[in-house]
Amino acid sequence: MSKICQITGKKAMIGNNVSHSKRRTKRTFDLNLFNKKFYYVEQDCWISLSLCAAGLRIINKKGLDAALNDAVAKGYCDWKTIKVVG
């Protein structure tokens, strides 16, 4: 599974570790990413999403249906990649 939020489209970033002597080595800044199940009322099923904490706050603010429609419109996910559970 890739490290991309399905609601916000955020990805893991690449940067540098900087030591005291200012030597730089590559590192990744990972997301606060987790898998979460939601009950999708419109289709009467459970869906599983991979999202970050900001994506969860967006779902709490807008609602699941509006957040999914916005994510599909912006191209962060499509209806084929949303996993239907059980």
Curated annotation (Swiss-Prot):
Matching InterPro entries, A to Z? Ribosomal_bL28, Ribosomal_bL28/bL31-like_sf, Ribosomal_bL28_bact-type, Ribosomal_bL28_sf
- Keyword Ribosomal protein included in the entry's annotation: yes
Q: Does the keyword Nucleotide-binding apply?
A: no
Recorded GO CC terms: ribonucleoprotein complex; ribosome
Pfam families tied to this protein: Ribosomal_L28
Q: Which family does it belong to?
A: Belongs to the bacterial ribosomal protein bL28 family.
In Swiss-Prot or TrEMBL terms, this protein is called Large ribosomal subunit protein bL28
Q: Which species does this protein come from?
A: Bacteroides fragilis (strain ATCC 25285 / DSM 2151 / CCUG 4856 / JCM 11019 / LMG 10263 / NCTC 9343 / Onslow / VPI 2553 / EN-2)
The gene it comes from is: rpmB
